[in-house]
Amino acid sequence: MSKMKLDDLDHQILDMLIENTRIPFTDIAKKLLISAGTVHVRVKKMEEYGLIKGSSLILDYDKLGYTFIAYVGLYINDTSKIKFIVQRINEIPNVTVAHITSGKFNIFCKIRAKGTTSAKNIIFKLDEIDGVYRTESMISMEESINDKKR
């Protein structure tokens, strides 16, 4: 598929959708002084091209009681087990992000917990996965930047 060329109108539509994925096409159309049909066609093209991949729900973890955030680096003794280890990590619901990385750790995870006891139990679960020989944890003191628009 060839590269999709976005014009200013496409960028304006995207900016509005990034700000609020649930904004009705009619609202976008009114603000941009175009028809809702134009918005629909352009969004559909961006979806077909794969530029837009659905929409997402953003949870307020604080309101759910998950105020404790930690980052856990996993050292793996056999990198051929990484796929298996990632599958096991995916079974732990409190692990919200996992990256296969270069450098100090083989896998780097973000966990959310209701407190230190819960976080300890999650970290122990990660440490018990076959193939993980050590973990290293860092507690997040404050999430200063979390810009979903970047």
Regions found by a protein language model. Name each.
Residues 1-150:
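A compositional/biophysical signature of low hydrophobicity enriched in polar/charged and small residues
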